[in-house]
Swiss-Prot record:
Protein residues bound to alpha-D-glucose 1-phosphate: Y97, G162, E177, K178, S188
Enzyme Commission identifier(s): 2.7.7.27
Originating organism: Pseudothermotoga lettingae (strain ATCC BAA-301 / DSM 14385 / NBRC 107922 / TMO)
Alphabetical list of Pfam families matching this protein: Hexapep_GlmU, NTP_transferase
HAMAP family reported in the protein's UniProt record: GlgC
Name the UniProt record assigns to this protein: Glucose-1-phosphate adenylyltransferase
Amino acid sequence: MRKVLALILAGGHGKRLGVLTEKIAKPAVPFGGKYRLIDFTLSNCVNSGIYHVGVLTQYRPHLLNNHINIGRPWDLDRKKGGVTILPPYLGGVAGWYRGTANAVYQNIEYVDSADPDFVLILSGDHVYAMDYNDIIDFHILKGAEGTIACIEVPPEETNRFGIMMTDLDSRIVDFEEKPQRARSNLASLGIYVFNWKFLKEYLIRDEQNNESTHDFGHDIIPLMINEGCQIYAFKFNGYWRDVGTVRSYWESNLELTRPIPPLNLYDRHWRFFTQTEEMPPAYCAPTSKIVNSIISEGCEIYGFVENSVIFQGVYIGENAVVKNSVVMTSTKIGENCVITDAVIAERVIVENRVIIGEGDDAKNKLDSDVYTGQITVIGMYSVIPSGSVIGKNCVVGVGVEKGDFKTQKVESGDYILHKE
């Protein structure tokens, strides 16, 4: 019987999500009405029969640690195996993880104690459904030393991924991380299977190389391929999304509201599990109207909701209109509000008669590289005062208070941050 250990890299900042990851790690970002991003990778593990999982955390880990806890929602609260949180070792000569490969290197003793045949290395911030047995079976069939899951991406997106070229037998003959000019459109998903003894040797060598960035895509994998190792590409044909930008995060959530969504959250044979607060069923008042939307438990809806994802415990007041938006847990939207093309984070208070997301297209003044999709983003714990008008592609930072608003109107592309 093969022994597989999964290692989930969950220490990422997710800077391209802007204020959504200012206080939490990217894998802890809410998604799909009740989940957090890491839930999809954890659920894929247990649905694939993998019950020995290490989660490597670093950036703002507290909420993520509390969310995973002992792993009970995923049936990972086990005496043998189960889930283990693996923060950086800050004593002795070690320190913060200096790259994806270094993160695994710092946990060599943990992996050795599990004595696996194969190590499955995963990212904790992607949304997808995958039976990992498929890639492991492929890996064994090919007699591979390492296998990388991949998909074909549009040519204009190749500079966001590790890009590989293969021979007719799917063996990888060239690999380049985020090339400016790609010779292929076959992109790595950041999902790897390695024979453990083989990988361990390369991790030790990489750690001794002072010129290395200690990253799988930049250093480890290119070295393996250049030295003629048996590294293969496993083509994945299912749903997979990198929700690393505000626009892709917003789009991927709203995809779930389609009549036939690309990711089926309701598949009884492939459930996604999460740790959530117990809440009563949603209530939709006689004054409410809901069209093509996800409404989670604990919500109270008195207004109009269309093409939106509404998380747990959200309150939407009478005559309020919410369209094409993502509204996260325990946010309150007052009466007579109009919210369009927005992402509103957790525990925000939007007072009465507020308009969000309407206006002309405009370049964002805070960070035009991060806020590019004409989506208005409201950070967690903020309060939007009555009568405010917030335009398109605006940003309201984390914890913004009424006193931070110097005027009722925030022009498209502008921003408001909390002043200490």
